[in-house]
Amino acid sequence: MKASGTLREYKVVGRCLPTPKSPAPPLYRMRIFAPNHVVAKSRFWYFVSQLKKMKKSSGEIVYCGQVFEKSPLRVKNFGIWLRYDSRSGTHNMYREYRDLTTAGAVTQCYRDMGARHRARAHSIQVMKVEEMAAARCRRPAVKQFHDSRIRFPLPHRVLRRQHKPRFSAKRPNTFF
């Protein structure tokens, strides 16, 4: 999978094709993060074939739809449980991100894993994504923003006063 652009969250439901032996086969639902619905269906078959004796030629996709965020204007904390294949083996990992949407947090995770661990998108498997309360967060990079009186420095302020002389004898100091 190529994690191009912002990933989207898809709900994919599939099953084995009905046979005389099992006329109503069980449905399997997955939450897939992919750039488009074609890749989402492909990832579904990849994961389902690992978990069950089921493949694309002997199955069907019942539903594939994009899941939209309930509150995309509120900043939330997300915990992501994943496994990835590195050059030395397979590792489990837990990561935390702050974002407006679940898909945004997962996209951030893919970018971060590529940058920090050189993990390609095809070798990352997101197992669980959960919205976390501020009290449950563990990573200091996320916890540093849990302050109601948070203040940010203004390192480079340019004062543009209207009636100030156009030319000055000395350069202005804009770093306070």
UniProtKB/Swiss-Prot annotation:
Task: Give the sites modified to Phosphotyrosine.
Answer: Y63
Question: Crosslinked positions for Glycyl lysine isopeptide (Lys-Gly) (interchain with G-Cter in SUMO2)?
Answer: K11, K128, K170
Q: Does the keyword Cytoplasm apply?
A: yes
One GO cellular-component annotation of the UniProt record comes to:
cytoplasm
Its transmembrane ranges are none
Q: Which GO terms describe its biological process?
A: translation
Specify the superkingdom.
Eukaryota
Recall the GO molecular function terms of this protein's record.
structural constituent of ribosome
Which cysteines does the record link by disulfide bonds? Answer: none
Subcellular location as annotated: Cytoplasm
As stated in the Swiss-Prot or TrEMBL entry, residues carrying the post-translational modification Phosphoserine are: S71, S123
Q: Which residues carry this modification: N6-succinyllysine?
A: K76
Name the keywords, alphabetized.
Answer: Cytoplasm, Isopeptide bond, Phosphoprotein, Ribonucleoprotein, Ribosomal protein, Ubl conjugation
Pfam families to which the protein is assigned, alphabetical: Ribosomal_L18A
In terms of InterPro entries, this protein maps to: Ribosomal_eL20 (IPR028877), Ribosomal_eL20_dom (IPR023573), Ribosomal_eL20_eukaryotes (IPR021138)
Q: How does it assemble?
A: Component of the large ribosomal subunit. Binds IPO9 with high affinity.
What does it do? Component of the large ribosomal subunit. The ribosome is a large ribonucleoprotein complex responsible for the synthesis of proteins in the cell.
Q: Which family does the UniProt entry place this protein in? A: Belongs to the eukaryotic ribosomal protein eL20 family.
Specify the protein name.
Answer: Large ribosomal subunit protein eL20
**Species name:** Oryctolagus cuniculus (Rabbit)
Upper classification of the organism: Eukaryota, Metazoa, Chordata, Craniata, Vertebrata
